[in-house]
Regions:
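Short, basic/polar, glycine-containing "phosphate-handling" surface segments that engage DNA
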Residues: 2-26, 58-59, 63, 77-87, ...
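Signature of N6-adenine DNA methyltransferases within the class I
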Residues: 59-62, 113-158, 361-362, 392, ...
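Class I S-adenosyl-L-methionine-dependent methyltransferase module
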Residues: 377-381, 392-572, 598-599, 604, ...
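Conserved acidic residues
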Residues: 71, 104, 378, 583, ...
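Active-site beta-strand-loop-beta-strand hairpin of nuclease catalytic cores
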Residues: 65-74
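Metal-dependent nuclease catalytic cores in nucleic-acid-processing enzymes
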Residues: 37-42, 89-106, 438-445, 637-647
Length: 798
């Protein structure tokens, strides 16, 4: 949407159409379409101050419509065609839009006559075009600015939009000018520390970002990988601001605030939009958990320090609010936001930001493997939730199942049940921002004003936290002063009273209150104020720990590092409390080779997770003539498998989609041994021969598995499905102790074959040595390097 203002000269649409009718006989259809649509856009611009974007020749189920302005579809013919032709075609397009979930009205026009068609296809009015101008004007004012589909929203708020490009450019300039400002610098460091776990800034992605930046006006400089990283950061800042405003718009529509528009919500007397953006948790208390602090709100700190950027950001937020006020978020599904994100960026840029939307077909495959039927007794968690696809599908199934009951529970009870059972966790703050909005959209019909008022504050249990991080209890002599150590990427290490001894929520609230709003913090005064707000018993037992905590946060405050990171610490506790509690853990953990993740995170994974620490099939490495060091190049997903098992209660089920390489790779030896000897393997679906679209425009070769946390029962069999190269499924059952290649070695790769084939293979093994045991015949792996772009050739032809 172009935000250029209308001229002062009044536009008479009726007269415009009258003049156009005089020339219509001599115009081509393309010229007539252009002049007609331009006249309508000029009228809307004059009446509202905003110029609606037209979408020409938009593809629908029944062909291509000539044009669309918001919620109005146009079919335009020249005068030599009867109007009925345009009416018939327009009705066909409306039917196509309806089947896509888009409700619109139609306008049929042939240069002389006009017909207005309702959402159901009924003809509301027909006559001379100029005579229908008044009714057409009313429809234009009502529908021309409406946002009706994701592609339309991309045009308004994505790269085609001047508004988006200007906002993103100003964010980047503000960041580069103020990157040493306390919170700004730390926000980028925290984001950078977790960025590599969700995305990979390849050379292809850097080049795509450079090309995109060059198309800005004026062009933005992205000259190297570091500047490309900054560009990705501000893109996520822009999108996170949009997500906050989406939720605020939903709150307006559901009457959770007194204001009737988002623009009014951001413009109360005596306040500025940038300031209100930071206050949304307070302004909309019923949805406060959605507005948790994250690394993306640094633009508010820049606005406090720089009036020029404050004015620019206020203007951009105001323009965004005007557009979002035309969006019906009550009727919007999770799929709307997914498609908006997918169409916002080119594939290389989307991969640079991170692929967060798992394809729903594979999600359903995982849930089916777990036996999830829309009911759950206990907690269901996705510890790598990304944008929340698993959570959304689970919520949808829970609601559908409940609605089918003879006596379904009241909405308020169902809402509390879902938010108490369905939990998401992710390390990437942008993914979490998307997941919270998607969680809200999935609850959809349950979010009525009446229901929300009945439950009070709605808690969305989607946590920004490192699900692999464990709370560390140091060895101490005095049990009474038991403490825990929390490590946060890029922030450091914090020692806290044990969460079973002290309520962390109260501790963090007291700490925030003890710190001054402005100016320099005196550690002694902070310590004194903190102790005043806590019980005497706690102060006496944890005096040394509290003194150190007060000193740490006072020092952070004096370096402009404030207490906004406390949620990260609190969320770690939320994850830790899931240990041994979950009935079902599902998800799609990141597939990243361990050497590609941030070094400190890599070291922690090796130190903390046995599946990684003891990785490397020793016998296999010997047979292949390679070192176990190479065999220990684990996939990051292996650590999440181990963590998922920790969070399960006895009898709980872990169901994930992971790389199919864990069936054979040397690095997955400890994992395979644990599954075969200590779990009941329920289901294996092997796509290693058949590419599967895990993400939009991205294919992989995954394995879907489901295991129960219980001692294996030899009487039970594992259901295995192999998918061949043309997508055909072959399902069979076998005892899980028949999976290992070597019957006496549960660490060995799995034989993904039916029992008859395995029996034949075992017969071949009897009394016969392995080639790897015969030195002269041992297969060799060859030279292994990390120089994947270099090739050794014998001769290059001239």
């Amino acid at each position: 949407m172009s935000l250029s203002k209308a001229s002062s000269s009044e536009i008479n649409l009726g007269e415009k159409l009258r003049q156009l009718a005089k020339r219509a006989q001599h115009l081509t259809e393309a010229t007539l379409t252009h002049e007609f649509i331009q006249s309508l856009r000029e009228f809307v611009l004059q009446a509202t101050g905003y110029n609606p974007l037209s979408q020409l020749e938009e593809r629908v189920l029944n062909g291509r419509s000539d044009a669309r302005l918001g919620g109005l579809i146009y079919e335009i013919k020249t005068p030599k065609h009867p109007l009925d032709e345009a009416v018939t075609q327009c009705r066909s397009y409306l039917d196509g839009y309806r089947r896509q979930g888009i409700i619109a009205r139609g306008v049929a026009y042939n240069g002389l006559e006009l017909a207005l068609i309702s959402e159901t296809g009924a003809e509301i009015w027909r006559g001379k075009a100029e005579d229908g101008a008044s009714l057409l004007e009313a429809w234009l004012l009502l529908l021309a600015s409406k946002v009706v589909d994701p592609q339309h929203l991309v045009l308004l708020l994505g790269f085609p939009s001047t508004l988006a490009c200007n906002f993103i450019a100003d964010l980047l300039h503000a960041f580069r000018k103020h990157e040493k400002l306390g919170f700004v610098e730390e926000a980028f460091k925290v984001w950078q520390a977790v960025y590599g776990t969700a995305a990979n800034l390849t050379e292809e992605a850097v080049n795509a970002l450079k090309q995109r930046a060059e198309r800005f006006s004026p062009p933005i400089d992205v000259r190297n990988r570091n500047e490309a990283l900054q560009f990705v950061f501000v893109l996520e800042v822009y999108l996170s601001v949009l997500l906050r405003l989406f939720v605020a718009r939903l709150a307006v529509q559901q009457r959770l605030v007194e204001q009737s528009t988002l623009r009014d919500l951001l413009h109360p007397f005596g306040s500025r939009p940038t300031e209100r953006l930071r206050q949304l948790a307070t302004v909309i208390p019923l949805l406060s958990s959605v507005f948790e602090d994250d690394p993306f709100l640094w633009l508010c700190d820049v606005a406090d320090a720089d009036p020029t950027f404050a004015d620019k950001f206020d203007s951009h937020l105001d323009d965004l609010a005007c557009i979002l006020d035309e969006l019906d978020l009550v009727g919007v599904s999770y799929d709307f936001l997914r498609r908006f994100y997918q169409h916002f960026f080119d594939p290389p840029i989307r991969r640079a930001l991170g692929e967060f939307y798992t394809d729903e077909s594979i999600v359903n495959e995982v849930l089916e493997a777990a036996g999830f039927d829309g009911t759950i007794d206990g907690v269901l968690a996705d510890i790598t939730c990304g944008s929340g696809t698993f959570l959304v599908v689970v919520i949808r199934k829970l609601i559908e199942k409940e609605r089918q009951r003879a006596r379904p529970m009241p909405d308020a009870t169902l809402l509390c049940s879902i938010t108490g059972k369905v939990i998401g966790i992710d390390l990437h703050p942008f993914a979490i921002a998307m997941a919270r909005v998607n969680y809200l959209l999935a609850l959809g019909e349950l979010l009525s004003h009446k229901t929300l008022q009945a439950i009070g504050r709605l808690h969305i249990p989607v946590y920004w936290a490192d699900s692999l991080a464990r709370l560390v209890v140091p060895k101490q002599r005095q049990l009474a002063s038991l403490t825990e150590v929390v490590k946060i990427p890029a922030l450091g290490e914090f020692t806290l009273p044990h969460h079973e001894e002290v309520d962390w929520e109260k501790l963090f609230s007291a700490l925030k209150e003890a710190l001054p709003q402005r100016g320099v913090a005196d550690p002694k005064k902070v310590e004194e104020q903190l102790k005043k707000r806590l019980d005497e018993d706690i102060v006496s037992r944890f005096e040394v720990t509290l003194n150190r905590l007060a000193e740490q946060w006072a020092e952070r405050h004096n370096r402009n590092r404030d207490s906004r990171w406390l949620p990260l610490i609190r969320n770690m506790l939320a994850v830790e409390r899931l240990r041994g509690l979950c009935s079902l853990v599902v998800g799609n953990p990141p597939w990243v080779r361990i050497h590609n993740i941030e070094p400190s995170l890599r070291n922690r994974v090796y130190n903390d997770y046995a599946f990684c620490r003891t990785a490397g099939w020793q016998r296999g490495a010997e047979l292949a003539g390679i070192t176990t060091g190479f065999a220990r190049q684990v996939d990051y997903a292996v650590a999440f498998i181990e963590r998922g098992l920790e969070l399960l209660k006895d009898g709980g089920i872990l169901a994930l989609v992971v790389t199919s390489k864990i069936q054979q790779a040397l690095y997955a030896s400890a994992l395979r041994e644990h599954f075969v000897t200590r779990c009941q393997i329920l289901r294996l679906v092997d796509f290693s021969l058949y590419e599967q679209p895990l993400f939009f425009e991205a294919t992989n070769y995954p394995l879907v598995f489901a295991v129960r946390k219980e001692k294996p029962d030899a009487k039970k069999k594992t259901t295995v499905t192999l998918v061949n190269r043309i997508g055909r499924h072959w399902t069979y059952k076998l005892p899980q102790n028949e999976l290992p290649l070597l019957a006496d070695d549960p660490q060995s790769p799995w034989l993904m074959a039916p029992t008859e084939a395995i029996a034949a293979f075992r017969k071949m093994q009897e009394g016969n040595p392995l080639l790897g045991d015969i030195e002269a015949l041992r297969p060799r792996r060859g030279v292994l390097t990390d120089a994947n772009r270099l090739f050794i050739v014998r001769r290059v032809e001239p």
